[in-house]
């Protein structure tokens, strides 16, 4: 095996990446000479060059490796390129379309759009869900519509939106065989329980999000009717795209999907595969702002061999004008561990104060990326003011903070902040509890990027605001992941908000804490710089 082929599958040396997106005519792209960092509100240069031809079906793995390596290296100068999130090797990424573990390695499939091949399948592999390496694109026959992957005992099943099913069993899932029988529907999720295979497919009819089919042999499929059907939780138009049905253990299941009119959602409940019905116990959202405007989009998930339920989403971006094309590329969120909150009862009733029904945490392996910690303790946050945090700055960081709001109305962090505050992103918790005792513990977690960028190419976007229910006396615990143009905020293990931000000033790296109404206290904060998972971006670490 030559050096290039060896490094292609070396998990410790994942490839750099490029997110060059196509214009509609697909004749030219804003491309390989990545734009220089914008100065103030200026626009980056976007020269047009001819697309380099590449036959994804005929070229071998070494050629794929060299092609992807070149594309990833060409993006290294892009100031908004994430250091530790997955992004594709050039061209457009859309829905994640399958996540599974096969023979000890994690595999991610995603919709990928090289020239003339819209919605083909990109493929990456990882040892830890953090460091990724590109694998050759799947055959171009595996395209046109999203789908999911599921690891069976002796093979991996992959669905695509045309109702096609593909299987593979080789170590790196490179050799795919099309199953001879198609099944009805689109946006399908497939799995097996006992002696039956099941497929859920997007529905979108009145009060119906998902339908379910059953088969013993993957050949003859019988419809079992509406799987997720509830007029209160699923309004007309909730189409159940990119759906996943995942076991939470204890007889509970988690449904993830994307609604084109409401965004990504989840349902916790009981799955009765005898009758083909899902009984909803709890319902929630993964995105609380405008759909397709810099937040989470489509999900993919699986249950790991250790029982963890893992979910990942693409971070959609439609707020950037076309002449900032280099910044518009979608990426995949950090992997999240999802579980049912054991403190929630099945029927909350009027007299029980609600809490977030789903726990959400980043995977532990992300801690391997930390370096150069800065620790602060017992910092007073002045009333109606802010306190800059000395020595805490950067564009690719993790912050872990504990804040005691005391009696303040709002507390939080300002990140990616310029010295004069012209650019800043605000993360806050509002203490707007209701007078009713069963809602008095409700708080509002927020990311506000309305002041994040001075660029006229960045369209305005309302804040992302999600509920966070706190126990009596519970402090605010934040884990904030900043990765140049994407921000993920985990709060108390029970809420997570995600947004994109595009600061233009090189000095927009500061962090401060603030309080409104009265004084608060920063109990502790640790800030780490984060290592790049892409070798050619190593020089950007710590900046």
Give the location of each predicted region.
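Bacterial N-terminal signal peptides that target proteins for export
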Residues: 3-17
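Functional cores that coordinate and move charged inorganic groups
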Residues: 241-246
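Short, surface-exposed beta-strand/loop micro-motifs that present aromatic residues
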Residues: 190, 298-301
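Boundary at the C-terminal end of the N-terminal hydrophobic targeting segment
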Residues: 29-31
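Beta-rich carbohydrate-recognition and catalytic domains
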Residues: 33-236, 247-293, 313-377, 414-419, ...
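Bacterial N-terminal signal peptides
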Residues: 17-26
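Beta-rich accessory regions
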Residues: 68-70, 272-294, 303-543
């Amino acid at each position: 095996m030559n050096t290039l082929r060896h490094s292609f599958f070396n998990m410790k040396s994942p490839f750099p990446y490029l997110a060059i997106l196509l214009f509609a005519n697909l004749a030219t792209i804003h491309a390989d000479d990545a734009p220089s960092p914008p100065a103030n509100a200026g626009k980056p240069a976007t020269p047009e060059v001819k697309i380099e031809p590449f036959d994804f079906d005929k070229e071998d793995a070494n050629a794929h490796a060299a092609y992807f390596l070149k594309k990833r290296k060409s993006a290294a100068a892009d100031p908004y390129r994430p250091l530790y999130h997955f992004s594709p090797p050039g061209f457009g990424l859309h829905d994640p379309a399958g996540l599974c573990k096969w023979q000890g390695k994690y595999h991610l499939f995603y919709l990928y759009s090289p020239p003339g091949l819209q919605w083909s399948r990109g493929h990456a592999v990882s040892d830890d869900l953090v460091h990724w390496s590109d694998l050759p694109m799947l055959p171009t026959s595996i395209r046109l519509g999203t789908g999911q992957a599921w690891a069976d005992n002796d093979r991996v099943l992959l669905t695509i939106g045309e109702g096609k099913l593909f299987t593979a069993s080789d170590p790196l899932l490179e050799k795919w065989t099309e199953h001879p029988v198609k099944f009805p529907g689109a946006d399908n999720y497939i799995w097996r329980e006992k002696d039956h295979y099941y497929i859920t497919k997007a529905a979108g009819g009145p009060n119906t999000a998902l339908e379910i089919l059953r088969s013993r042999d993957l050949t003859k499929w019988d419809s079992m009717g509406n799987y997720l059907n509830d007029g209160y939780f699923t309004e007309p138009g909730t189409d159940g795209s990119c759906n996943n049905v995942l076991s939470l253990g204890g007889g509970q299941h988690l449904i993830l999907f994307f609604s084109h009119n409401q965004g990504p959602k989840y349902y916790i409940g009981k799955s009765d595969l005898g009758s083909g019905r899902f009984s909803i116990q709890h319902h929630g959202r993964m995105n609380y702002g405008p759909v397709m405007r810099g937040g989470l989009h489509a999900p993919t998930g699986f249950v790991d061999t250790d029982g963890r339920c893992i979910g990942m989403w693409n971070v959609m971006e439609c707020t950037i004008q076309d002449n900032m094309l280099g910044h518009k590329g979608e990426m995949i969120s950090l992997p999240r561990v999802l579980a049912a909150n054991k403190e929630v009862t099945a029927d909350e009733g009027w007299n029980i104060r609600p809490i977030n029904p789903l726990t959400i945490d980043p995977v532990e392996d992300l801690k391997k990326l930390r370096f150069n910690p800065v620790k602060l303790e017992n910092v007073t946050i002045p009333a109606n003011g802010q306190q800059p945090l000395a020595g805490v700055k950067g564009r690719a960081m993790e912050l872990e903070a504990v804040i005691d709001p005391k009696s303040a109305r709002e507390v939080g962090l300002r990140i990616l902040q310029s010295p004069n505050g012209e650019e800043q992103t605000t993360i806050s918790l509002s203490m707007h509890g209701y007078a009713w005792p069963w809602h008095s513990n409700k708080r509002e977690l927020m990311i506000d990027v309305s002041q994040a960028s001075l660029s006229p190419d960045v369209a305005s976007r309302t804040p992302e605001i999600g509920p966070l229910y706190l126990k009596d006396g519970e402090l605010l615990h934040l884990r904030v992941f900043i990765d140049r143009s994407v921000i993920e905020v985990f709060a108390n293990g029970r809420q997570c908000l995600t947004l994109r931000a595009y600061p233009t000033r090189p000095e927009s790296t500061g962090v401060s804490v603030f309080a409104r109404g009265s004084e608060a206290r920063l109990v502790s904060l640790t800030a780490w710089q984060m290592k790049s998972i892409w070798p050619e971006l190593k020089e950007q670490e710590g900046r």
